Structures are given as structure tokens and as C-alpha cells.
From Swiss-Prot:
A zinc finger (RING-type) spans 72-117. A zinc finger (TRAF-type) spans 113-186. This is Zinc finger TRAF-type-containing protein 1-A. GO terms for molecular function: zinc ion binding. It comes from Xenopus laevis.
Length: 365
């Protein structure tokens, strides 16, 4: 008949020092020595909490773990387009890669990888097609129906297939302002009153639409005129978030210095014109100012506008602004960033950085 053996003294004492008790388990059938079990004691914290924390790594879904593996080492976001890697394999999205090269040019330094500090350039870095394909297969939420789809199929789903996507009435051409989810479109069009309006009523609506169209054409004609100027410069700019040093800090954005038209510039942006508590407002806006950092010999008259960058999908209506820069007056007023609505503004605020493209046209007399 076998006996249960007690744990040796040193083991019991050392286990107690670790905040655990030594328990005994009888071997089934009475064969062989008993095994020692370490049981959590009260001093080691709630057992349920310990078990949950131990189970966390395995409970996280594969795609969620891949987000941190495949994200850009600079902005920590999943790449939306091309993915570049340094000679040691660290990943950078196309936007951040271009910014690193541009910043190094301004500082007259060799661009380096933010992780390992190895040299990077267009010739030293290469695209990682495997990561690009892996990212395109990761699931992402549709902003309308909140269902998940592979990132490569999400755009098509949002434009053509989603039953909750925002759509417009087919009678928009004769003035119907209705917008709503696609699954309500058929019911609305069957009840829409615009097809039954008289010719005189429709003429008033069409006159208003003509005025709107005329303003849009004036804007595009102005842009085409600017494109005929001799001195034109453009660059991708990256607004980075910062906090003021006030007692109640406020969010603002600023770009690194960049060079356009042989001059050094900076862009700054603020939320809701720096109101005290923008988080309490349901309406969100962004405004920006252009600052000339270089010294100039004579006044510099410029037109400028911001557009969406090549690697982002923010919706911006182009607006042309005009300013005469001098050494004494080198900052424009804060002007609205022409995003279409508060939803788009929230998308920008939720991103790590805001990537846009700036055009500057120098007006010569």
C-alpha cells in the first residue's frame, strides 16, 4: 500500500515565499509518488483575474495581433497603399517613407529608419508585396453597416453593395435634396413629389442649381488659370498632433518645416478655432494657417490651396486662398480647412497624422 509523501521543508518554505500553497494529489491506483501542486493563495490576488490575464494572449484574434505586426513603424497605422521596408525589414507606409526622405533633405542629413537607424533611400528600400497583400486581406469595418470585409473589397462594398450606404434620389437633377440609406431609396422615389411639380416650380429650383454649378465652374477655371503660372510648387504635408502648455491643454497640429518655391514654410491647424471645450460640441471644424519662415527681399504674393494627399481618402472641397507675405507679415489668418462635414473632421482627428497636399502659386507682376 503506497503512502502519500509530504513535500520537503525547503520546497514548502520557498513556495510560501512566492505566495503559493503546496497541495498534494494522490496518484490514481496508488502507484508511484504523489505529485505536488502549486495552488494560488489569497495573497497572490484573485484567482479569476490571474486566469484571465494568462488567457488573454490566446484569446486575441489573429487579425488583431497582425495589426501590430504589419503596421507602419512611423505612424503605427496599417498602410493604405505601398509598403516599404528598410534593409533590416522594418515596415513604412508610402506616406511616412516619403516624409522621412523629405525631412532628411531639409535637415541635410542622411535619412534613417526610426527603428534601427540604418540608412534609407529610394534605392536602399524596397516594397514588401507580401505585407501589402496581407494587409489587403485583413478585415475592416464598413462605416455604414458596421460589418467586416477584407480591406481590398471594402471600397467596392461601400460604393456599390452596402444596403446602408448613403445615396441620393434619382430626381436630384430636378431639385430633390433627399439623402438616405440605399434600402430606403425605392420607397422614397415612389413617394417623391418632384416629378409632379409644375414647370414654373421646377424652373425656380433649376435656377438655384445653375448658380451652384456656376460657382463650381468659377473655382475650377481659377485653378486652371493658376496652373498656367510660371512659379508653382507643391508638396505632401503631414500635420502632427501636439498639446499646448496651458493649464487646460488644447489640441493643435503642426507640420515639420518644408521647402516650396525655394522658401521654408510651416502649416499649423487648430480644432473649432481653439474653443475651450471642443469635445462638448457636436460640430467639428479644422482651420489652418500658412507661415513663411524664410526671410525675403520683397513682398511675395501667393495663392495656395490644400487637397487630399495621394495615400488618404479624406473628402475636401478645394478652396483657393490668397495672401501677400512680407518679413513683417509672414503668417496668414486661420482659414477653414474645406472638409465636407463633421464626420470627415472626426476621421481626421482619429488618425495618427493628417496627410494632405499643398499647392502654392507665386503671382508675379
Amino acid at each position: 500500500m503506497s503512502e502519500e509523501r509530504e513535500a520537503p521543508g525547503p520546497l514548502a518554505s520557498s513556495s510560501a515565499g512566492l505566495g503559493a500553497e503546496v497541495g498534494q494529489e494522490e496518484v490514481p491506483g496508488g502507484a508511484g509518488p504523489a505529485r505536488l501542486l502549486l495552488l494560488p493563495s489569497d495573497s497572490d490576488g484573485p484567482p479569476k483575474k490571474r486566469l484571465r490575464s494568462e488567457a488573454e494572449p490566446g484569446s486575441v484574434r489573429l487579425e488583431e495581433r497582425l495589426y501590430s505586426v504589419l503596421c507602419c513603424t512611423v505612424c503605427l497605422d496599417l498602410p493604405k497603399a505601398s509598403v516599404y521596408q528598410c534593409t533590416n525589414g522594418h515596415l513604412m507606409c508610402a506616406g511616412c517613407f516619403i516624409h522621412l526622405l523629405a525631412d532628411s533633405r531639409l535637415k541635410e542629413e542622411q535619412a534613417t529608419c526610426p527603428n534601427c537607424r540604418c540608412e534609407i533611400s529610394k534605392s536602399l528600400c524596397c516594397r514588401n508585396l507580401a505585407v501589402e497583400k496581407a494587409v489587403s486581406e485583413l478585415p475592416s469595418d464598413c462605416g455604414f453597416c458596421l460589418k467586416q470585409f477584407p480591406r481590398s473589397l471594402l471600397e467596392r462594398h461601400k460604393k456599390e453593395e452596402c444596403q446602408d450606404r448613403v445615396t441620393q434620389c434619382k430626381y436630384k437633377r430636378i431639385g430633390c435634396p433627399w439623402e438616405g440609406p440605399y434600402h430606403e431609396l425605392t420607397v422614397h422615389e415612389s413617394e417623391c413629389c418632384h416629378p409632379t411639380k409644375t414647370g414654373n416650380e421646377l424652373m425656380e429650383i433649376l435656377d438655384e442649381m445653375d448658380q451652384t454649378h456656376k460657382k463650381e465652374m468659377q473655382l475650377y477655371n481659377s485653378i486652371f488659370s493658376l496652373l498656367s503660372f510660371e512659379k508653382i510648387g507643391y508638396t505632401e504635408v503631414q500635420f502632427r498632433p501636439y498639446r499646448t502648455d496651458d493649464f487646460i491643454t488644447r489640441l493643435y497640429y503642426e507640420t515639420p518645416r518644408f521647402t516650396v518655391l525655394n522658401q521654408t514654410w510651416v502649416l499649423k491647424a487648430r480644432v473649432n478655432d481653439s474653443e475651450r471645450n471642443p469635445n462638448l460640441s457636436c460640430k467639428r471644424t479644422l482651420s489652418f494657417q500658412l507661415i513663411l519662415k524664410s526671410k525675403i527681399n520683397s513682398p511675395m504674393e501667393c495663392s495656395f490651396l490644400l487637397l487630399k494627399g495621394p495615400y488618404d481618402d479624406v473628402k475636401i472641397h478645394p478652396v483657393i486662398y490668397h495672401f501677400v507675405f512680407t518679413n513683417e507679415n509672414n503668417e496668414t489668418e486661420y482659414v477653414p480647412l474645406p472638409i465636407i462635414d463633421s464626420v470627415e473632421c472626426n476621421k481626421l482627428l482619429a488618425a495618427k497624422n493628417i496627410n494632405l497636399r499643398l499647392f502654392i502659386f507665386q503671382i508675379q507682376k
